């Protein structure tokens, strides 16, 4: 079974995301996909090159990084499921509004044409603000499944939401059966 693993630019979560990628690589063939931000931005959490290399080492293939590289995902039915982890607020907005102008959003659009699941692991500082509407739109869409999420710092960042990445494998399994894992909201 082949699973796409798309990464957006919520760099602070990479230390939690890469171990889950490693766990999934033991059971699935993973096709890594990097957003433009993930592909190019160096941050205090590491360089773009280091992140690309780590994904390559885990998955055994270099991440796809362009619209042209990901567009065949749908027509060639390359994936059984697509994970977006972390899924930043900008990508949430684009998915909610049907905008496919990055490698990750085009991968989702192309993959969804086959009626197969997209698993979203949200990570955004405005999840209970501007991004809340976009999360709501995606929650009711067919073939969209969310990794359970909650506030990561209710006092310091009261609108921030982040997925519990350790629940990504069980969310993927449920999504492949057409089910949303519960509970979705973590307290």
What would you call each of these model-derived segments?
Residues 1-118, 123-187:
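A cross-family phosphate/adenosyl-ligand binding-site feature
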């Amino acid at each position: 079974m082949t699973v796409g693993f798309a990464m957006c630019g919520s760099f602070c979560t990479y230390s939690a995301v890469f171990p889950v990628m490693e766990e999934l690589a033991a059971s699935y063939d993973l096709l890594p996909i990097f957003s433009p931000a993930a592909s190019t931005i160096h941050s205090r959490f590491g360089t773009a090159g280091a992140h690309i290399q780590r994904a390559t080492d885990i998955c055994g293939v270099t991440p796809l990084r362009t619209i042209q590289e990901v567009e065949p995902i749908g027509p060639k039915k390359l994936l059984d499921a697509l994970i977006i982890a972390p899924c930043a607020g900008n990508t949430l907005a684009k998915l909610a509004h049907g905008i496919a102008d990055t490698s990750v959003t085009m991968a989702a659009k192309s993959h969804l044409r086959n009626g197969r699941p997209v698993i979203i692991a949200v990570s955004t500082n405005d999840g209970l603000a501007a991004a809340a509407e976009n999360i709501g739109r995606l929650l009711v869409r067919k073939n969209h499944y969310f990794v359970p999420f909650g506030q990561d710092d209710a006092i310091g960042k009261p609108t921030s939401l982040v997925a519990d990445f350790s629940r990504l494998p069980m969310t993927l399994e449920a999504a492949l059966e057409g089910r949303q894992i519960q509970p979705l909201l973590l307290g």
